[in-house]
């Protein structure tokens, strides 16, 4: 995921790199940067299958059209994430196209969510589209948030720490 963000021009760095339970972890420092669309090759899919929902959100704010390929595994996660991502992007006014194992997302200057985001009880879909809602004048509404506590119980408190207003 980090490599794809760097390809897109993200200004991010790792600090305080360490190991926890046999996995590398770090603090991430991110600064504003203008993102650009990229082709995300299929060889990234296995290592970042859970990051595609948030990557699609970032793609909606990247100049150009981002194409992600090799996404068949997204269809058999907690939900058919490929369709969930696509349908919800369309609900937010983001231009997108998809096929059996690919997704294209085009830059969207103004996100306008006129319909409730359908999460399909998938925490990653819920969190990703709530983040997209931060760029919408009136935010977004999602149909369910209970499942977010499963993976990130501090999600809303962290957003509030950043000054996000949550209704």
Give residue spans per PLM region:
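Short, structured segments at the rim of ligand-binding sites
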Residues: 1-167
